[in-house]
């Protein structure tokens, strides 16, 4: 299936624009000018539609690659995001190293929202991949959510719930880096458009932290570029790319 069928631009150009927008914290108009400098004439409203269509798909396809190898000590917190002039709550989790675990956008801050967030973060994890320690602020919603997940068997009974403020410093710092990406938006139009865009931001943040490095066949940014392209079936397969790199290596060594 061609994900870019009917588009006026190639998949490579579209992913280039979406990846840049989600990675570098620039406005749609600035990105329009940057692409124009490279001979690509596209309106900023078209770039917006690309981000809405492909950012969440990019996060979905890359999720398997970056959601691996977490430390079992997690940090949970929420930050604020403006949607239609009102504050929404972006729940986020990282491990003690700062690697992104998961996120969830909610219009409310409640035990129900906290449970949905934690349930999403735990979904698909084997028992041995689930956290042994959860650090949160003192909001009672987290305690209620954790207790309910334990009763449902989704968290082990011995999972420790801590409320140590300084342990969340790594997550607070990560909030700040995400806010740099969100700032040019100047407020989202709706919850669906906000969530779609944030999914792209979070996916690019995870790649930038090196969470998918084992699956990047080339070093640096080009490894990430090719991983994104392969996720959409663009360019050579991983096997072909590996064989090409090996051939070049032995040719240069000869």
Question: Predicted segments — roles?
Answer:
Residues 8, 108, 112:
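Conserved phosphate-coordination/catalytic loops
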Residues 1-82, 116-254:
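Charged, often Cys/His-bearing segments associated with DNA-binding zinc-finger transcription factors
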Residues 100-101, 131:
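Short, solvent-exposed beta-strand edge segments and adjacent coil->beta transition regions
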Residues 84-100, 110, 118-122:
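Short conserved beta-strand segments at catalytic cores or DNA/RNA-binding microdomains
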């Amino acid at each position: 299936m061609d994900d870019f069928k009917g588009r006026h631009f190639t998949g490579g150009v579209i992913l280039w624009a979406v990846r840049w927008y989600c990675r570098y914290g620039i406005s749609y108009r600035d990105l329009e000018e940057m692409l124009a400098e490279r001979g690509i004439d596209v309106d900023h409203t078209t770039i917006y539609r690309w981000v809405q269509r492909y950012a969440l798909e990019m996060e979905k396809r890359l999720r398997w690659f970056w959601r691996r190898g977490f430390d079992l000590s997690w940090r949970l917190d929420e930050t604020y995001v403006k949607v239609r002039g009102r504050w929404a709550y972006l729940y986020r989790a990282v491990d003690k190293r700062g690697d992104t675990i998961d996120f969830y956008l909610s219009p409310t801050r409640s035990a129900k929202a906290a449970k949905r967030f934690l349930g999403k973060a735990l979904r698909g994890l084997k028992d041995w991949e689930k956290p042994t320690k959860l650090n949160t602020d003192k909001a009672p919603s987290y305690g209620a959510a954790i207790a309910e997940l334990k009763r449902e068997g989704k968290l082990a009974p011995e999972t420790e719930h801590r409320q140590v403020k300084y342990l969340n410093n790594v997550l607070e710092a990560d909030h700040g880096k995400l806010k740099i990406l969100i700032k040019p938006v100047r407020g989202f139009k709706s919850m669906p458009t906000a969530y779609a865009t944030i999914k792209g931001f979070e996916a690019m943040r995870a790649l930038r932290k090196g969470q998918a490095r084992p699956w990047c066949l080339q070093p640096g940014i080009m490894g990430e570029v090719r991983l994104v392209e392969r996720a959409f079936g663009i360019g050579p397969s991983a096997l072909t790319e590996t064989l090409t790199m090996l051939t070049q290596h032995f040719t240069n060594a000869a």
